[in-house]
């Protein structure tokens, strides 16, 4: 073991550790981090070398965070990344510092970053909040307004999770939606992601995603936001229904096929006559 460790450079150790961390199941970052910490046995190397992995994990997972003094939680995403561990909360018009390891927000400061699209962002944010409240019992959303490659763009992010470690499962829903404000019609692009980990007497993960494309009529802010949410609702309902139907089909067919109906001999054992079988006699003589 010592010879192997001597052959592996610190850079390679950090790379392996970072990969474990970025692939941690939802709600299990701390468990994976603690395991990696024991394996690496070098806290300074882990914190300095794998810091980017902590940040990448939180942004990929749309980690929600509560900022002291503000009611709504905001999502940690690449779209809100301002650099130097600071992130944007467009709804509350602030930026804040985020500790990727402790998952805590601090130092809120005023920040205007809607790219001159305040009314568009607020209309979409208001409509999306109502949708998330109706459809996700533990859901959060953040809406950004940016100018990307010269195009005014709305980006909507949704996160909802259920962490049930006592029941040996954790799961998270994420979706991201974009459209450019280009009348009369704009393309809507979305990606939906589901990740669930079940680990009682086994280790099963569901990792699924779906890409969506649609179009929305761009008129005034309120009407466009309403049509935007209709597209989101239809696509997400359709995806969730398809996932449920697929699991029902798997339960009725695939999983049943995994269970052996008869022993290898293709003959059922008559337990009332077990003593007449050779194995029964051998057991009796044992």
UniProtKB/Swiss-Prot annotation:
Keyword Transferase: no
Modified residues annotated as N6-acetyllysine in this record: 19, 97
Modified sites of kind Phosphoserine: 9
Family matches, as InterPro entries: CapZ_alpha, CapZ_alpha/beta, CapZ_alpha/beta_2, CapZ_alpha_1, F-actin_cap_asu_CS
Localisation: Cytoplasm, Cytoskeleton
SUPFAM superfamilies in UniProt: Subunits of heterodimeric actin filament capping protein Capz
Keywords attached to this entry: Acetylation, Actin capping, Actin-binding, Cytoplasm, Cytoskeleton, Phosphoprotein
Residue stretches spanning the membrane: none
GO cellular component, one term: WASH complex
Residue positions, PTM N-acetylalanine: 2
Assigned protein family: Belongs to the F-actin-capping protein alpha subunit family.
Assembly, per entry: Component of the F-actin capping complex, composed of a heterodimer of an alpha and a beta subunit. Subunit of dynactin, a multiprotein complex part of a tripartite complex with dynein and a adapter, such as BICDL1, BICD2 or HOOK3. The dynactin complex is built around ACTR1A/ACTB filament and consists of an actin-related filament composed of a shoulder domain, a pointed end and a barbed end. Its length is defined by its flexible shoulder domain. The soulder is composed of 2 DCTN1 subunits, 4 DCTN2 and 2 DCTN3.
Name this protein carries in UniProt: F-actin-capping protein subunit alpha-1
Source organism phylogeny: Eukaryota, Metazoa, Chordata, Craniata, Vertebrata
Gene from which the chain derives: CAPZA1
